Amino acid sequence: MKALLASLLESSLNSFQKLSLTHCYAIKCGSISDIYVSNRILDSYIKFGFLGYANMLFDEMPKRDSVSWNTMISGYTSCGKLEDAWCLFTCMKRSGSDVDGYSFSRLLKGIASVKRFDLGEQVHGLVIKGGYECNVYVGSSLVDMYAKCERVEDAFEAFKEISEPNSVSWNALIAGFVQVRDIKTAFWLLGLMEMKAAVTMDAGTFAPLLTLLDDPMFCNLLKQVHAKVLKLGLQHEITICNAMISSYADCGSVSDAKRVFDGLGGSKDLISWNSMIAGFSKHELKESAFELFIQMQRHWVETDIYTYTGLLSACSGEEHQIFGKSLHGMVIKKGLEQVTSATNALISMYIQFPTGTMEDALSLFESLKSKDLISWNSIITGFAQKGLSEDAVKFFSYLRSSEIKVDDYAFSALLRSCSDLATLQLGQQIHALATKSGFVSNEFVISSLIVMYSKCGIIESARKCFQQISSKHSTVAWNAMILGYAQHGLGQVSLDLFSQMCNQNVKLDHVTFTAILTACSHTGLIQEGLELLNLMEPVYKIQPRMEHYAAAVDLLGRAGLVNKAKELIESMPLNPDPMVLKTFLGVCRACGEIEMATQVANHLLEIEPEDHFTYVSLSHMYSDLKKWEEKASVKKMMKERGVKKVPGWSWIEIRNQVKAFNAEDRSNPLCQDIYMMIKDLTQEMQWLDSDNGVDADSLHA
């Protein structure tokens, strides 16, 4: 009879219905009283995830042994019900059943999953009392528990108590030091493990270590790890390869990531595809990301939420709007529109569209039922980026009144709005709120405060914020301070700060050079600026981007060196983008190089026929030259092409209220009196400065 039941249970492993029938048969024939049979059925219920049925059977069992108790404890911990598992463990001890190594291991696994260090210490005491601290399975579980609770010193002590640590013990300890990002100790342990002939390194050893190597400075170390993986013949382990794809992409070596990806052949899983797409997107290789997605479709690879979030982050340019909207349709078709991370990615995508408005992003935000902090931060940042600073402030207030706790990112976005509005009083209030909320030492909040005070004209307060930062190696804070001095015409101070940055080994990035080139441009430090541009790649290992060339063109233009600016553009390794050309157009116009300006403008109209900037620049240039027919021709062209000038807005803070207005705004009921006052002020300014030869056309209210 026992053999028949064993056979029936074996055939029930993949069918809950068969398991139920086998259970009924065991009751009917009286075999359910056999503890072996009961334990087998109990274990099967647990494996199917039917904890309720398992619990009823456990309560009805006339006899229970340690296997019965351990099976139920394992079931509760697997379902995340640690309190029930702990209660059952206590009952097990009281019942007189033997608590063994398996009991401790299963309980410690549950404690590790929820990081209940307090319970872990109690169990450790019982382990010592029971004499199991040298047991490799219990010891490994203790190491894992302490490691996941980020108590790596305790994990190391527990590890040293194990008489013969195995791969699981070593992997748990290494993973603990990975979790606290102690790269030095983690790799030291890897070296020790490598010297142990009896211990085998596997995917559990390398996969966590690879997650640490997420910066270009670790590229050589990553290649060493890759060599070890090849030496051990683990190059086809999917977990290791997926981690390696992500690490190579994070280190900036996308070609190596693609090589690992291609080496997987037909054994790629969904994580492999998603990791490669994310790597391409991160490094602005958008077309490669889209092509890989198309390959996924050809290979009938099922997509998931991570596929779409990786792709949506690449749909930021105007040329990718159609593809981005198609992805939006796929997200809806998949039924993922109420998945918060998917909607957050869609909100960010619509915000980043250059010609887009906030309407689509706001509609998505409002339709999302379970908004998280990223949702709020995205919409606040979107308003700030689009210049809708009042809306950013309003939504920050809504966030504060919700149950979600405000973080440093929200404060940074709001302070950016204050910077754009140049509302000092509001900025100071947010500064006080950030201090009260404990974010005043955060590098991103500090950087935003530096920008805000700089734009509000209080460079001394910006400097005080910079001096208060806890991390003296914060690149974003140094960049903000350099740019702040640049905006105040203190180029030499910016250069001194740049030198300090280099001497203190603060990491330089693209923004650093944009800031320092801007500083040189604003203060006429031509030689210094050009020298820095030329040294970027050979000395600082940073390849110049379009924004750096645009800053250098502006630098030469401000000095009246139009031909030098033209030569610089012609010597660029890549074709100049619209940003560089628009900068050069401004230079030509300011220096009176009308013919050259017209050529640049015509080229811009070919590549960006819908952008209003070029039309407006041409119109103003012809107006300055009093060429009214040409100006009328530009206006006509705009009308025919449906191009409208985006009005520029200005703000002023009066009695704690922000007033917004644009050029020739007549919506204010007092506009007649306002324009009369402007006229009187303009006439008075002309009269006062007539001796200095100030051109009336240069006076703007």
Curated annotation (Swiss-Prot):
Superkingdom classification of source: Eukaryota
InterPro entries, sorted: E_motif (IPR046848), Pentatricopeptide_rpt (IPR002885), PPR_At4g14850-like_plant (IPR046960), TPR-like_helical_dom_sf (IPR011990)
Keywords: Repeat
Region (Type E(+) motif) residue spans: 656-686
Segments of this protein annotated with the region Type E motif: 580-655
Gene Ontology process terms (BP): RNA modification
GO MF assignments: RNA binding
PROSITE patterns xrefs: PPR (PS51375)
UniProt PPR repeat ranges: 34-64, 65-99, 100-134, 135-165, 166-200, 202-236, 237-267, 269-303, 304-338, 339-371, 372-406, 407-441, 442-472, 474-508, 509-539, 545-575
Gene3D superfamilies: Tetratricopeptide repeat domain
Family annotation (NCBIfam families): PPR
Family designation: Belongs to the PPR family. PCMP-E subfamily.
This protein's name: Putative pentatricopeptide repeat-containing protein At3g25970
Gene symbol of the encoding locus: PCMP-E46
